[in-house]
Amino acid sequence: MVSKMIIENFEALKSWLSKTLEPICDADPSALAKYVLALVKKDKSEKELKALCIDQLDVFLQKETQIFVEKLFDAVNTKSYLPPPEQPSSGSLKVEFFPHQEKDIKKEEITKEEEREKKFSRRLNHSPPQSSSRYRENRSRDERKKDDRSRKRDYDRNPPRRDSYRDRYNRRRGRSRSYSRSRSRSWSKERLRERDRDRSRTRSRSRTRSRERDLVKPKYDLDRTDPLENNYTPVSSVPSISSGHYPVPTLSSTITVIAPTHHGNNTTESWSEFHEDQVDHNSYVRPPMPKKRCRDYDEKGFCMRGDMCPFDHGSDPVVVEDVNLPGMLPFPAQPPVVEGPPPPGLPPPPPILTPPPVNLRPPVPPPGPLPPSLPPVTGPPPPLPPLQPSGMDAPPNSATSSVPTVVTTGIHHQPPPAPPSLFTADTYDTDGYNPEAPSITNTSRPMYRHRVHAQRPNLIGLTSGDMDLPPREKPPNKSSMRIVVDSESRKRTIGSGEPGVPTKKTWFDKPNFNRTNSPGFQKKVQFGNENTKLELRKVPPELNNISKLNEHFSRFGTLVNLQVAYNGDPEGALIQFATYEEAKKAISSTEAVLNNRFIKVYWHREGSTQQLQTTSPKVMQPLVQQPILPVVKQSVKERLGPVPSSTIEPAEAQSASSDLPQNVTKLSVKDRLGFVSKPSVSATEKVLSTSTGLTKTVYNPAALKAAQKTLLVSTSAVDNNEAQKKKQEALKLQQDVRKRKQEILEKHIETQKMLISKLEKNKTMKSEDKAEIMKTLEVLTKNITKLKDEVKAASPGRCLPKSIKTKTQMQKELLDTELDLYKKMQAGEEVTELRRKYTELQLEAAKRGILSSGRGRGIHSRGRGAVHGRGRGRGRGRGVPGHAVVDHRPRALEISAFTESDREDLLPHFAQYGEIEDCQIDDSSLHAVITFKTRAEAEAAAVHGARFKGQDLKLAWNKPVTNISAVETEEVEPDEEEFQEESLVDDSLLQDDDEEEEDNESRSWRR
């Protein structure tokens, strides 16, 4: 054993390490020295220890690691770290610290224990220099040296107890009551009065000082193992009783932030202890340097090193106790509540059952009793009668912690029996893996260990805990108020102790928690290779259906049984695989179930149904424990509570299905499956063929209906999407066919025009050629007519879905498209598709008359011989009744001589003259054919629409090509010309006629 064979004096080596590490390391030299000491103490060979030290210290020392390790082992082997036997400089140092005591202090040879004693007295008496009380105290100490040496050696061998620290703190609190005197005078006189009152107390105080030499080490000391020295609780000291202290059960995973009520008077004594403890007890002692400000204290509000910090914390420091996490976040301080009236300047203690102040973050659960399974992790061993054996066994009025603490991981010792009347068995968490707060190290630690033999593998060890516990009914103790904040609870934002706020399900509520009534902690239940069932929790109701779960879990293996709404919980499910390997594969998968990371998967445990129901917050109705097998044959109402066990075989389930309600339930399951089964199988067989264990499951009807609706909606949504896609494909195909037909039609028309012009120009053509051309024209005419009919037949179908829109919707869509087009054009983006859509909308709007300008009344009814209905007959009817006229004249205008940029605006331009029935624009030849609803509208467009954007368009009537002779054509043309001249009548004249009629009508109405 390298550590015991070579190292003779751990304290001397630690001092040597601190001095050596200080110039080469940014970390705290004292803490790192203890870490190095813990590494060197390991039971390994020198070679292994060197490798271990180099590996572990590389992160701290980096380039200096190798040199330092070699230097360390040389010092250990040569014992050069040991100080010289005498300390000639200590006397001069003492004179420098206490100039007023120079004449009175005896100059004698001092042993190592005497040096420590003097160092401690200097530490306590450093800040307020009052010579008289210190002189008397040092005199009395010198007289007691011989008596105390043996006791000191005993205390050095045995682990120190926490009551000495509490003693000093209580005395400090007692001294702090006087605010009217100066800090130093009050401190000295109180000390003098106490010693004069009780000499035995002074003697015991000297014993405790030797122990405090070890207690003032940093709290993250790596070889610290005794839980008794981890924490202390300041409790009020009653003036007449000096020994009534009670230990408080606190744990290594908690932080205690204490702001004492005597801030003003404890400044220097509590924060000036580090300097001399850090220097060696021998020739390495240096005179004190002026302290710099502590950066951690200024930035965070408190310092993790506490009394051990070498830097200045100011005049009002906050005492931080029991911290094993150096990187802890800042936490507001809270003064402890004392018995009796509070000191001046502080508010009275809070009333019983008052939650912690609002400014404490995160809030702490309300006070309550500790569980019977909590081991006594603090308190001195039994031989001391004035102290309670543990905070758990203390009487109700003792100064125990008013806030429940949590249990550290890995404690396997049995606690002493606790009074069963004070505690309940179901209030505390157990040891287990918490995925939300994993422990860095999972190594088990015994409850009581000797300091010398302690070894830790890591620099910093964290323990897991969960403070989200249900509210307690136990009132807090009046004598102390202690704020204990768990390291995990820093992440919480809602305290579970607040009324009306639901508490988070604690770890013991999880399905795989082994809830036995054993007082100790149970090991995690190891599931055997025969378990094939998985439980799902927190499944959203919309996802908790058979089809979704089957889709996800069938990838891992064969599903034997699948139950949703398991255990009456709409968010629960049970899945059974054919083999254990498949189930393990499913539970080990890193993929989130159904893409939802909140869904939890656990191993299913037989017989845990009743326990889960008692702890599950979702099952609101009380459940009676009863045999599981007969539940299947109960009525539907009864079966809505506990779920039948999944151990029933399908044959038993079929025999139980003779009940009518059971069949009804199975029918609903069939509906829930969406008729997945084959139609040739009966209802019962359908259920069994889909999922073997479905007949064993009792469902909540409300959950079934909701899930069935969700399934139907999702199925219909999928069908709608597919139908929409098919519809779009069909429309696209139809448009392509129509476009192709349109192209063929245009080619035929061009050919027809060419042949007609050929006939007209060549008057001297032979009769044979003329006959051939006429035959070709006939064929072309038939084809053109046929193609036109096909195109027209396809056109209404294309516009049918859009014709449902109202006029307002059409206008809104047109305006929106126009705005989008304008924005994209301004931004310089591609607008071809948007322009095409805009043109189609314009065409549709023009066909429905939405784009017409509405110039005057009756613009659509001003035809030849139009009847006004008032018997006046003012239209140019030529003596023929309007309803008897069949107008076969063309209503389509052929438009040309426009540019590519004008093509989009052409349709709106002509739409203002009337309702457009059809519009065909040839992109290649810049030729358009617009068909109006009536001849009059077409004539108005021909007269007024020829001028477009400052240029003249070429307009011509688009006549349907028929096999007519030139004579008939000549007869038609004068009629058109005549009507064109007639239609040139100004619209204002017609408008005047209308106004005249309105006047007559109004006068006749008045008569």
Curated annotation (Swiss-Prot):
Residues 228-241 have a biased composition (Polar residues). One of its GO terms (cellular component) is nucleus. Residues 719-795, 823-847 form a coiled coil. Residues 106-241, 334-404, 460-519, 853-884, 966-1007 are annotated as: Disordered. There is a cross-link at residue 106 (Glycyl lysine isopeptide (Lys-Gly) (interchain with G-Cter in SUMO1)). Residues 169-186, 857-877 have a biased composition (Basic residues). The keyword Secreted does not apply. Residues 334-388 have a biased composition (Pro residues). The modification Phosphoserine is found at residues 127, 496, 518, 616. There is a cross-link at residues 94, 106 (Glycyl lysine isopeptide (Lys-Gly) (interchain with G-Cter in SUMO2)). The modification N6-acetyllysine is found at residue 510. Pfam families: PWI. A zinc finger (C3H1-type) spans 288-316. Residues 394-404 have a biased composition (Low complexity). Residues 532-606, 891-960 form the RRM domain. Keywords: Acetylation, Coiled coil, Isopeptide bond, Metal-binding, Phosphoprotein, Repeat, RNA-binding, Ubl conjugation, Zinc, Zinc-finger. Residues 968-1000 have a biased composition (Acidic residues). One of its GO terms (molecular function) is zinc ion binding. Residues 106-118, 134-168, 187-201, 209-227 have a biased composition (Basic and acidic residues). PANTHER family: RNA RECOGNITION RRM/RNP DOMAIN, RNA-BINDING PROTEIN 26. May be involved in the turnover of nuclear polyadenylated (pA+) RNA. This is RNA-binding protein 26.
